[in-house]
Amino acid sequence: MIRLSLIIPTYNRARQLLAALESVVRQDMPAGEWECVVVNNNSTDDTAARFAAFAARYPALNLRMVTETDPGVSYARNRGIAETSAPYMAFIDDDERINAGFIRAYVEFFDAHPDAVVAGGRIIAEYVSGRPAWMSKYSELPVANPMDFGHAVRPFPAGRVPGGGNMAFRRSATARYGGFDPSLGRVGGMLIGGEENDFFERMM
């Protein structure tokens, strides 16, 4: 039984996506209890072909790709929600890597906290050649969206919500509150945000 669906929207970042998937296939959760659904948001590069070749290497895992033709991360996330049925859903971005216990941690959290609807975790920015000199502690938040409140399970600080690169929620939440607002969120190279804040504010 699939207990959690990991959803990864992607657009024209085949190389980064494959690096993310390399971390996904190392999950320590039994393969029959999770799936990974990549939402191809009309990529024009070789994302589809490279994903197919990658997935063929892991026939025992539930790896699949679906397509969303309307551009924008909100449309892509909503497509991922529509194409899955697991009671729990988690989202990461296509340029991230997750640790081996990522999926198991979310499943165990929701199992242990039946009243919890939403959860989020650490997002640690990694810079290829060091933190850019122009980036201040103020500009890093909207650009890299780092988030680190430690390892302990606790409520999110007042005024903060999970980041889109590491968030999870119960499927029942989307049935009650709807999905992501397509008028918000990144579209192609346009770094428009706000879709996560809007989504979580509807739940509060």
Residue map of PLM features:
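Cell-envelope/extracellular polymer assembly enzymes that use nucleotide-activated donors
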Residues: 2-5, 35, 198
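A short, conserved alpha-helix in the catalytic core of glycosyltransferases
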Residues: 164-169, 173-178, 185-204
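Conserved donor NDP-sugar-binding/catalytic core segment of glycosyltransferases
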Residues: 101-135
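Glycine-rich, basic loop-to-helix element that forms the pyrophosphate-binding segment
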Residues: 68-84, 105
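N-proximal low-complexity "stem/linker" segments adjacent to membrane-targeting elements
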Residues: 1-26
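Short, flexible, basic/aromatic active-site loop/helix in glycosyltransferases
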Residues: 121, 138-160
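Short aromatic/hydrophobic "clamp" motif used to bind/position activated sugar donors
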Residues: 89
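A conserved acidic beta->alpha catalytic loop
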Residues: 23, 40-50, 96
